[in-house]
């Protein structure tokens, strides 16, 4: 133990040579939003994950990433049409629930091949998911019904071979190419100009923090928004584009602390935090 402590004490912190960095990552680095945030938050963690490609052993089951994919699928397919609206343009709850159930069944059939061969645990899990997914869809529908913005694109890709080119930045002589997807793009035409907002569904607990943006993290939605302003004219009917903002929407049915006297408005405000 003493020998190991002496060895550790004699070690010095160094850095990789430029030749080693080029050999490891190349001179053109393709970055996703999560990779960019990982690099800004901890260089060593980035090196271990994306340089050494070390991975933790994953447990079998329907984990958070799979749940996020499932919810994104439901939201995308529900809001590709306007059939959930009532005659006044508001939310028809019965139509919305029926459409949500239909999309969930489609996901189970097309993405999972049905549940007949799955474990009883997974079948039970999907039965339990229906109620919270309905609540998530209802929350998104009510936000849309109160807005002049309408969905005009879903899962919009940035990168080679996708809907729009990647976001490219030059850093220390290297070209960083950022690729990824925007969950939803909403548009509103006013005075002949197209106002765009990008929508990010939050299935986890991560929230938007302006301090992160100041420190170079959590920039992806803003980068995508300004890339849409620059590159999206031909994609959206030739309108001149104005960036209207970034909207982070909770895509989970959170359990909140409350009381019997809590109003519906107060409950929704707590859920949206």
Features from the language model and the residues they span:
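Structural signature of nuclease core domains in nucleic-acid processing machines
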Residues: 1-273
């Amino acid at each position: 133990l003493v020998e190991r402590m002496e060895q550790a004490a004699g070690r010095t912190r160094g850095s990789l040579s430029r030749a080693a960095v080029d050999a490891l990552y190349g001179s053109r680095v393709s970055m996703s939003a999560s990779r960019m945030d990982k690099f800004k938050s901890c260089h060593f963690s980035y090196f271990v994950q994306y340089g050494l490609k070390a991975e933790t052993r994953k447990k079998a089951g329907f984990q958070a990433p799979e749940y996020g994919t499932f919810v994104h699928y439901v939201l995308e397919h529900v809001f590709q049409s306007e059939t959930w609206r009532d005659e006044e343009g508001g939310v028809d709850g019965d139509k919305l629930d029926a459409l949500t159930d239909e999309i969930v069944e489609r996901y189970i059939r097309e993405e999972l091949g049905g549940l007949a061969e799955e474990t009883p645990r997974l079948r039970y899990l999907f039965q339990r998911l229906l109620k919270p997914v309905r609540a998530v869809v209802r929350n998104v529908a009510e936000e849309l019904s109160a807005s002049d913005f309408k969905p005009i694109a879903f899962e919009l890709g940035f990168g080679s071979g996708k809907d729009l080119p990647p976001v490219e930045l030059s850093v220390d002589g290297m070209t960083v190419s950022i690729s990824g997807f925007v969950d939803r793009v909403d548009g509103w035409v006013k005075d002949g100009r197209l106002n765009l907002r990008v929508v990010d569904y939050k299935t986890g607990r991560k929230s938007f923090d302006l301090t992160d943006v100041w420190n170079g993290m959590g920039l992806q939605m803003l980068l995508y928004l300004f890339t849409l302003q620059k590159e999206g004219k031909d994609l959206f009917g030739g309108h001149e584009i104005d960036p209207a903002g970034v909207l982070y929407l909770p895509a989970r049915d959170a359990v909140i602390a409350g009381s019997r006297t809590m109003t519906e408005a107060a409950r929704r405000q707590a859920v949206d935090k």
